[in-house]
C-alpha cells in the first residue's frame, strides 16, 4: 500500500530489515514468531495491517532473506488474520463486544485467544513444512 511504501526508506525499515535478516539466519520459526509479534503489536496500537504487511512482505521477499515465496505469503496472510482478530480495536470485535455487552479486550483475548492459540500452533507446523518443501 501507499503508507507501507512510504515507510520503506525510514529508520523503521532498516531496523526491521536487520531483525528479519538476523532471525531468518537462526530459524524460520523465530522469524515467523517475530513477524506475528510485530504485526499484532502494531494492530493493538491501532496501526492497520494494510500499513505494516506490505513493509514486512517487501523485506521478506528480498534476496537477502532466504525463504520461499509461499512461506512469505503464508506468514503475511496468517499474521494479518491473527492480528486483526486479536486486536480489541478491530471493528468486528467492537461490534461483537457491544452486542454481547462485554469488554472488547475480553472478546479479543479470552474468547478468541483459545482458538487462535491452537491455530497458531498449526500455522507454525505448516510454515515448517512449507520451508522444508521449498
Features from the language model and the residues they span:
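Juxtamembrane and boundary regions of transmembrane helices in multi-pass small-molecule transporters
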Residues: 80-134
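Helix-loop-helix connectors at the membrane interface of multi-pass transporters/channels
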Residues: 22, 58-65, 94-104
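Hydrophobic alpha-helical transmembrane segments of multi-pass integral membrane proteins
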Residues: 24-63
Amino acid at each position: 500500500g501507499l503508507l507501507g511504501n512510504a515507510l520503506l526508506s525510514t529508520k523503521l525499515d532498516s531496523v526491521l530489515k536487520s531483525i528479519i535478516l538476523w532471525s531468518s539466519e537462526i530459524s524460520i520459526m523465530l522469524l515467523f514468531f517475530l513477524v506475528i509479534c510485530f504485526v499484532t503489536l502494531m494492530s493493538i496500537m491501532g496501526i492497520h495491517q494494510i500499513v505494516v504487511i506490505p513493509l514486512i512482505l517487501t523485506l521478506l521477499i528480498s534476496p537477502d532473506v532466504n525463504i520461499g515465496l509461499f512461506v512469505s505469503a503464508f506468514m503475511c496472510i496468517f499474521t494479518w488474520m491473527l492480528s486483526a482478530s486479536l486486536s480489541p480495536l478491530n471493528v468486528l470485535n467492537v461490534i461483537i463486544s457491544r452486542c454481547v455487552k462485554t469488554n472488547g479486550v475480553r472478546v479479543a483475548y479470552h474468547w478468541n485467544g483459545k482458538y487462535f492459540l491452537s491455530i497458531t500452533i498449526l500455522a507454525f507446523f505448516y510454515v515448517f513444512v512449507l520451508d522444508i518443501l521449498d
